[in-house]
């Protein structure tokens, strides 16, 4: 049985700012955007979250919720330095590390001899070491599979951890809301609820064929997760090549104004996800995806050095006009392709 830890730093960017400037600790702060121009919140500290300020929220909305919010532009070199230090701490316990972004990672400690092989104690020691060496707090989840470890890391935030032992998995899954499973969005959750499926326990009683007919490949993933099955390894060689966000509509759309409104809502989430992986927002390409009512889909992208909403909207409009052919659109997606590390080094040297 595997021992997987998911470590997630607590409001990481904001925490680095509060550590380096103690005057910020007890006031609402957020990273990203400014009062003078439009932007989105990358992360917010817990005092700001009490006012409803959240990641990917437009700055204007955040300021309405919390007029005295302190906005910081972000010091991404400092965040990267802290992230590298945290990664080095992980490596003291295992070589099997899969970074997901600057502030979270999976660790496979199945074969680790530290702390007498106890994943629970390893997670505690890692969190304490991070605090001792960086004065930053982390939350952790421990489980026999990746998706449960990720869910567990959110159970006792901030500065806590939650353990799901192999023996506890069946009972935990019985009442686990399907919306907690990574990949189950609002639209999918609504469709599942309409079928009477709210928890993993409900799905366990459902026929796999029914799920496959309704959800395709995702139906199998949903069925497996509800049984506690997740055979994905912690991949130390994992190199993220793209970042994307998409939305499947409850009803097909037929007007460009509807598509543009969806892009406006998707863009802040794309920006937030990209910032966690590439704080400087440098990219190789960006593009859009439309899936039509006949389940055919089309993708169009441009070479572009930095994430740019205006270009994405223009690309989407061109795709809408030239490729839709009067069909309804059931899905809208935005994505970016990240720079190859070697190419990125060459660009930096060229500067």
Curated annotation (Swiss-Prot):
Q: State any GO CC term.
A: cytosol
Ordered alphabetically, the record's keywords are: Cytoplasm, DNA damage, DNA repair, DNA replication, DNA-binding, DNA-directed DNA polymerase, Magnesium, Metal-binding, Mutator protein, Nucleotidyltransferase, Transferase
Give residues annotated as binding Mg(2+): 8, 103
Please write the reaction equations for the catalytic activity of this protein.
DNA(n) + a 2'-deoxyribonucleoside 5'-triphosphate = DNA(n+1) + diphosphate
> In chain numbering, where does the site feature Substrate discrimination fall?
13
Subcellular localization(s) per the UniProt record:
Cytoplasm
Entry-linked InterPro entries: DNA/RNA_pol_sf, DNA_pol_Y-fam_lit_finger_sf, DNA_pol_Y-fam_little_finger, DNA_polymerase-Y, DNApol_IV, IMS_HHH_1, Rev_trsase/Diguanyl_cyclase, UmuC
What is the active site of this protein? 104
Q: Does the keyword Nucleotidyltransferase apply?
A: yes
An example of a GO molecular function for this protein is:
magnesium ion binding
Which part of the chain is the UmuC domain? 4-185
Q: How is the cofactor bound?
A: Binds 2 magnesium ions per subunit.
Q: Which GO terms describe its biological process?
A: DNA-templated DNA replication; error-prone translesion synthesis; SOS response
Name the Pfam families on file: IMS, IMS_C, IMS_HHH_1
> Which EC main class describes this enzyme?
transferase
**Cofactor names:** Mg(2+)
**What's the EC number here?**
2.7.7.7
Q: Does the keyword Protein biosynthesis apply?
A: no
Q: Which residues form a coiled coil?
A: none
Q: How does it assemble?
A: Monomer.
Family indicated by similarity: Belongs to the DNA polymerase type-Y family.
Known role: Poorly processive, error-prone DNA polymerase involved in untargeted mutagenesis. Copies undamaged DNA at stalled replication forks, which arise in vivo from mismatched or misaligned primer ends. These misaligned primers can be extended by PolIV. Exhibits no 3'-5' exonuclease (proofreading) activity. May be involved in translesional synthesis, in conjunction with the beta clamp from PolIII.
What is the protein name given in its UniProt record? DNA polymerase IV
Q: Which organism is it from?
A: Escherichia coli O1:K1 / APEC
């Amino acid at each position: 049985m595997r021992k997987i830890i998911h470590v997630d730093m607590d409001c990481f960017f904001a925490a680095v700012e509060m550590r380096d400037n103690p005057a910020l600790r007890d006031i609402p702060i957020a990273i990203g955007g400014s009062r003078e121009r439009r932007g989105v919140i990358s992360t917010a500290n817990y005092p700001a979250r009490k006012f409803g300020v959240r990641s990917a929220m437009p700055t204007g909305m955040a300021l309405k919720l919390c007029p005295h919010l302190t906005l910081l532009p972000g010091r991404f070199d400092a965040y990267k330095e802290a992230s590298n230090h945290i990664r080095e701490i992980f490596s003291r316990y295992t070589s099997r590390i899969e970074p997901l972004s600057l502030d979270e990672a999976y660790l496979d400690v199945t074969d680790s001899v530290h702390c007498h092989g106890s994943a629970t104690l390893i997670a505690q020691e890692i969190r304490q070491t991070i605090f001792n060496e960086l004065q930053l707090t982390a939350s952790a989840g421990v489980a026999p599979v990746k998706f449960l470890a990720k869910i567990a890391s959110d159970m006792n935030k901030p500065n806590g951890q939650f353990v799901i032992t192999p023996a506890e998995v069946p009972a935990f899954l019985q009442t686990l809301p399907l919306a907690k499973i990574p990949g189950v969005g609002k639209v999918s959750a609504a469709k599942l609820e309409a079928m009477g499926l709210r928890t993993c326990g409900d799905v366990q009683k459902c026929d796999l064929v029914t799920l496959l007919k309704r959800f395709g490949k995702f139906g199998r993933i949903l069925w497996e997760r509800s049984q506690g099955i997740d055979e994905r390894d912690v991949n130390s060689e994992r190199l993220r090549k793209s970042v994307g966000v998409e939305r499947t509509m409850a009803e097909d759309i037929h007007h460009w104004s509807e598509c543009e409104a969806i892009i406006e809502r998707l863009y802040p989430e794309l920006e937030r996800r990209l910032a966690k992986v590439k704080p400087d927002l440098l990219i190789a390409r960006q593009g859009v995806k439309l899936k039509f009512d006949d389940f055919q889909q089309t993708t169009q992208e441009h070479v572009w050095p930095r994430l740019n909403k205006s270009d994405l909207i223009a690309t989407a409009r061109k795709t809408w006009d030239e490729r839709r052919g009067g069909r309804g659109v059931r899905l809208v997606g935005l994505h970016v392709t990240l720079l190859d590390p070697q190419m990125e080094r060459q660009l930096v040297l060229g500067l």
